[in-house]
From Swiss-Prot:
<dbReference type="Pfam" id="PF06794">
    <property type="entry name" value="UPF0270"/>
</dbReference>
<dbReference type="InterPro" id="IPR036685">
    <property type="entry name" value="YehU-like_sf"/>
</dbReference>
<protein>
    <recommendedName>
        <fullName>UPF0270 protein YPO0179/y3960/YP_0178</fullName>
    </recommendedName>
</protein>
<dbReference type="InterPro" id="IPR010648">
    <property type="entry name" value="UPF0270"/>
</dbReference>
<comment type="similarity">
    <text>Belongs to the UPF0270 family.</text>
</comment>
Length: 78
């Protein structure tokens, strides 16, 4: 289930974004980027709609994923 990021308390959203970035451990190439920059990138993706907050009832977890991946996963389950 998609959770509208606008309905999440700002401090909670900040914590979710930071935890996601730390968990992902994404390599940004030659130039290391700060945690703040990485969090800002993910926030921009949420705001633009490229990424969505997804609640898994099965696992009782929340995740951030590309909108296209969420739709593809939902279609596969139907």
């Amino acid at each position: 289930m998609i959770i509208p990021w606008q309905q999440v308390d700002s401090e909670t959203l900040d914590n979710l974004l930071e935890a996601f970035v730390l968990r992902e451990g994404t390599d940004y190439g030659e130039h290391e980027r700060s945690l703040t920059e990485k969090v800002a990138d993910v926030r921009r993706q949420l705001v633009s709609g490229e990424a969505v907050l997804v609640w898994s009832e099965l696992h009782e977890t929340i995740n951030i994923m590309p909108r296209g991946s969420f739709r593809a996963g939902a279609e596969e389950q139907q």
